[in-house]
């Protein structure tokens, strides 16, 4: 006979699962997992966002350097820029504010300082719009939003915000999913470009995952005039990548 479980300590009550905070509805949680998945057909795997040229020119040649470089990019380009756009665009889509959506999309385009970085956000935005069109076939209201997105032309942060807008997810959860999806793609790029083993990649991903909540919190408190995309060395690296002799990635 199995031993009886130990009794709860005197003066304490066993936790009641029914009283625990309720999480996301299953459908919304699965949608966020789907959006963060590297299997989402938007082509994120084909971009390194400057990491490939950093391996050649900026000393990113081992696990420690790759982890530090990616963590800097998380804080410099994602937390201060793209994640803040996702946060603000999510609110705009849910409010039906088309002018605000357009302004945020234009801001993303203006912050891409090289042709390959601009092509990346445009290509991934178009691909996500195509995916949304297929997902919402037969839903006139959703397709109307997708048509507005496709007409911009869309950037990836604004398209991601629309993809999440029709879920019941909180803004924080949407940004966590977006950031983790970015981290997974970048770790896979590091594994190929440095190169690194799978275990090293998982250690880097663990470091990024630990930093993501702070990056999301920072992005969510930024106002309209506080977003920024000041990362001049990334622009220099990206420009050099355009003429790099041998490349695996498109950025």
Curated annotation (Swiss-Prot):
<dbReference type="InterPro" id="IPR038277">
    <property type="entry name" value="UreF_sf"/>
</dbReference>
<protein>
    <recommendedName>
        <fullName>Urease accessory protein UreF</fullName>
    </recommendedName>
</protein>
<comment type="subunit">
    <text>UreD, UreF and UreG form a complex that acts as a GTP-hydrolysis-dependent molecular chaperone, activating the urease apoprotein by helping to assemble the nickel containing metallocenter of UreC. The UreE protein probably delivers the nickel.</text>
</comment>
<keyword id="KW-0143">Chaperone</keyword>
<keyword id="KW-0996">Nickel insertion</keyword>
<dbReference type="InterPro" id="IPR002639">
    <property type="entry name" value="UreF"/>
</dbReference>
<feature type="compositionally biased region" description="Low complexity">
    <location>
        <begin position="9"/>
        <end position="20"/>
    </location>
</feature>
<comment type="similarity">
    <text>Belongs to the UreF family.</text>
</comment>
<feature type="region of interest" description="Disordered">
    <location>
        <begin position="1"/>
        <end position="20"/>
    </location>
</feature>
<dbReference type="GO" id="GO:0016151">
    <property type="term" value="F:nickel cation binding"/>
</dbReference>
<comment type="function">
    <text>Required for maturation of urease via the functional incorporation of the urease nickel metallocenter.</text>
</comment>
<dbReference type="Pfam" id="PF01730">
    <property type="entry name" value="UreF"/>
</dbReference>
<keyword id="KW-0963">Cytoplasm</keyword>
<dbReference type="GO" id="GO:0005737">
    <property type="term" value="C:cytoplasm"/>
</dbReference>
């Amino acid at each position: 006979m199995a031993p009886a479980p130990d009794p709860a300590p005197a003066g304490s009550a066993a936790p009641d699962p029914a009283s625990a905070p309720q999480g996301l509805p299953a459908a919304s949680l699965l949608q966020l997992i789907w959006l963060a998945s590297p299997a989402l057909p938007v082509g994120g795997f084909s971009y390194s966002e400057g990491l490939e040229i950093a391996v050649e020119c900026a000393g990113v040649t081992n696990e420690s350097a790759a982890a530090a470089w990616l963590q800097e990019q998380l804080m410099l380009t994602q937390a201060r820029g793209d994640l803040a756009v996702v946060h603000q665009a999510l609110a705009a889509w849910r409010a039906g504010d088309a002018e605000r959506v357009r302004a945020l999309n234009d801001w993303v385009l203006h912050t891409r300082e090289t042709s390959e970085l601009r092509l990346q956000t445009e290509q991934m935005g178009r691909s996500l719009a195509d995916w949304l069109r297929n997902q919402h076939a037969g839903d006139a209201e959703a397709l109307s939003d997708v048509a507005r997105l496709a007409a911009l032309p869309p950037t990836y942060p604004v398209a991601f915000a629309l993809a999440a807008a029709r879920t019941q997810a909180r803004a924080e959860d949407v940004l966590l999913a977006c950031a983790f999806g970015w981290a997974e793609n970048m770790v896979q790029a590091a594994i190929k470009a440095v190169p690194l083993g799978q275990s090293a990649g998982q250690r880097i991903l663990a470091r990024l995952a630990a930093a993501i909540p702070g990056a999301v919190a920072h992005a969510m408190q930024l106002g309209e005039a506080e977003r920024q995309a000041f990362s001049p060395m990334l622009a220099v690296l990206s420009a050099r990548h355009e003429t790099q002799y041998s490349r695996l990635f498109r950025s």
